[in-house]
Design a protein with these regions (language model features):
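Basic/polar, cationic surfaces and motifs that engage anionic cell-wall
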Residues: 147-164
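Cell-envelope/glycan interface and biosynthesis
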Residues: 1-144, 153
Length: 164
């Protein structure tokens, strides 16, 4: 059963913020090959706290899935981009190079429903993909009330706190 993620301590996020304030994010990026078996692409993520290694492990596992499932993860719509969370003044995890958005055409996002008071949750991302990301320390935007099913961000401290 899918559950929503709660809050937890933020040592990882504090480290990301410190690096971003110093303007050092770009110097800490690493290019990895995303889903090479399925004709994926090169993406850039941070090396801080092993985000690059975690995403590489995710890529290797998803690359072993059948094409009809892996296609939900191709192409990557974005990783590193210095920006804010839509509608806020908070930096997105994309600004730290610690988030990935998957295939937009296979995703659902609450804002796409217009101005509904209570958006109806929708999802097309296979749970097999979600489980692989979570196994490697990523949280899924599909678990949020204001859902964003294409979005995964590296927040291992939240995964660990949920398991306790």
């Amino acid at each position: 059963m899918l559950t929503r993620v709660g809050s937890a301590s933020r040592p990882y996020l504090s480290r990301c913020t410190e690096i971003a304030k110093k303007g050092e994010v770009g110097n800490r990026l690493r290019t990895i090959r995303w889903l090479p078996r399925h004709g994926g692409q090169s993406v850039q993520v941070t090396r801080v706290n092993g985000v690059d290694r975690a995403l590489e492990a995710v890529s290797e596992e998803i690359d072993q899935l059948a094409l009809n499932i892996a296609t939900y993860a191709i192409p990557v719509a974005g990783t590193y981009k210095c920006r804010f969370v839509a509608g806020t003044n908070n930096r997105s995890m994309h600004a730290y190079g610690a988030a990935v958005d998957l295939n937009v055409k296979q995703s659902n996002y609450w804002r796409w429903q217009g101005r509904l008071a209570h958006p109806v949750w929708q999802n097309r991302i296979p749970y097999e993909i979600v489980k692989i990301f979570e196994k490697h320390g990523f949280i899924w935007g599909g678990r949020w009330y204001h859902y964003d099913t294409m979005h995964f961000e590296y927040r291992p401290e939240l995964i660990e706190s949920r398991a306790q």
